[in-house]
């Protein structure tokens, strides 16, 4: 739908300053304030990816993003090899089907936003409303907050950060995001998840249960899968 009709564009920051957003400092051991529940939508060379990645607030218009060795890191490294930045949108508090699709891991040629749209149609009987950011990235129009910009050629320190196991993750050199614009709904609600708590474990573990069940069924009949509390909802299953 048109940006003019999109709730996420009801308010636009005159001057980019992400430090004014209600982004929490979750644990005392963390490096600082972290975006923990936002979804990054990236497009480059005709390929789109939508996924979760924590983001450290470095300053008014820069984040440092932890990219684990999955599709988005592959995209960024390929673009860097050709001297390109990667255009992105960062969406906060979209419809839950977007969160679920972004938490899944597919083959690199599967578009998570298309999966989210299919889930929305299946559950609600209506299309998922999408709109276009000023940099050309398509994102859910009903998100509470949207930011747009680029994953740059620069790296900076990311971490320490308390991760899903409750232990402190290492400091690494990770890509820097430059934010070009910020918009939000009227009376917006900023979605954050507490690292290592129930929502974190649900979003990481829930999409894995069907893949584990399918894999086990190739060897022996599997009735159900439970990701255990002892495995932090991620590292072990029965």
In which residue ranges do the predicted regions lie?
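Extended, highly charged
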Residues: 1-161, 166-238
């Amino acid at each position: 739908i048109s940006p003019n009709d999109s709730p996420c564009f009801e308010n636009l920051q005159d001057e980019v300053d992400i430090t004014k957003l209600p982004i929490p400092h979750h644990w005392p051991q963390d490096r600082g304030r972290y975006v923990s529940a936002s979804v990054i939508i990236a497009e480059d060379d005709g390929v789109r990816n939508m996924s979760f990645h924590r983001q450290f607030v470095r300053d008014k218009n820069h984040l440092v993003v932890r990219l684990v060795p999955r599709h988005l890191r592959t995209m960024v490294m390929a673009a860097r090899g050709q001297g390109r930045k990667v255009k992105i949108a960062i969406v906060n508090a979209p419809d839950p089907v977007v969160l679920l699709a972004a938490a899944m891991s597919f083959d690199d040629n599967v578009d998570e936003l298309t999966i989210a749209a299919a889930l929305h149609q299946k559950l609600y009987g209506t299309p998922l409303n999408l709109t276009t950011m000023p940099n050309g990235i398509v994102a859910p129009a009903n998100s509470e907050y949207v930011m747009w910009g680029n994953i740059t050629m620069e790296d900076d320190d990311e971490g320490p950060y308390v991760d899903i196991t409750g232990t402190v993750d290492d400091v690494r050199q990770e890509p820097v995001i430059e934010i070009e614009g910020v918009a939000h709904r009227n009376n917006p609600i900023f979605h954050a998840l507490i690292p290592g708590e129930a929502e974190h474990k649900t979003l990481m573990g829930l999409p894995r249960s069907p893949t584990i069940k399918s894999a086990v069924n190739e060897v022996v009949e599997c009735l159900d899968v439970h990701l255990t509390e002892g495995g932090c909802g991620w590292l072990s299953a029965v």
